[in-house]
């Protein structure tokens, strides 16, 4: 399952199961369930996050990817006790809520870290507060250009870590740095995923 935001054309884009959007009636039934059982006022994002989690629970999924809406520490998705935290980049954005420096923003993003759980960081220049939070929680940190790296050629690209080297990877529709970070995340998962599956997914 994948929960992402914002949507571009239709709300249904936010919640995908087995790479498929869900029909309107599935969402409205979930909305009704949340509305009947909520005990306090919810923001739009909190409501949609709860609905997504409800749908994922009904589907009995093995893996769920939750995209943080804003920051991390106070984000609605942070209600979930995740098994793996992924930081793609650290940019100056939403400064009214997250702080005006990369250091302040990195602290907010590090709010999704969990004690003794793996963390994958795709940002090459990691601010100290994020590293300190990972150390404080005894997280296993996998960092770009430290634990893994990638390089593009003319027609393909390669990715390597301390454990494995993947060559002749096809280019995909997302930024290469994000794809490389995703591969670093895959390496942390307790699943045996073949190189063929990785190439097909890219």
Region locations from a protein language model:
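Short amphipathic beta-strand/extended segments with alternating polar/hydrophobic composition
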Residues: 21-26, 162-170
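A short glycine/serine-rich beta->alpha loop
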Residues: 38-41, 167-173
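ATP-dependent carboxylate-amine ligase catalytic core
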Residues: 2-80, 96-98, 104
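Acidic, Mg2+-coordinating active-site environments of NTP-dependent enzymes
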Residues: 62-67, 82-166, 173-199
């Amino acid at each position: 399952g994948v929960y992402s935001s914002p949507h571009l054309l239709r709300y249904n884009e936010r919640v995908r199961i087995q790479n498929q959007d869900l029909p309107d009636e599935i969402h409205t039934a979930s909305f009704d369930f949340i509305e009947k059982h909520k005990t306090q006022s919810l923001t739009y994002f909190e409501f949609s996050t709860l609905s997504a989690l409800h749908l994922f629970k009904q589907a009995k999924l093995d893996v769920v990817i939750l995209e943080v809406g804003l920051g991390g520490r106070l984000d609605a998705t942070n209600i979930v006790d995740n098994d793996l935290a992924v930081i793609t980049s650290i940019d100056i954005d939403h400064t009214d809520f997250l702080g005006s420096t990369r250091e302040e923003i990195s602290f907010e993003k590090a709010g999704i870290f969990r004690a003794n759980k793996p963390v994958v960081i795709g940002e090459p220049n990691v601010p100290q507060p994020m590293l300190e939070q990972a150390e404080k929680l005894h997280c296993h940190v996998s960092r770009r250009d430290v634990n893994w790296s990638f390089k593009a050629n003319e027609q393909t690209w390669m990715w390597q870590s301390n454990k494995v080297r993947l060559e002749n990877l096809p280019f995909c529709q997302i930024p290469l740095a994000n794809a490389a970070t995703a591969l670093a995340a895959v390496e942390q998962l307790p699943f045996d995923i073949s190189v063929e599956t990785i190439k097909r997914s890219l």
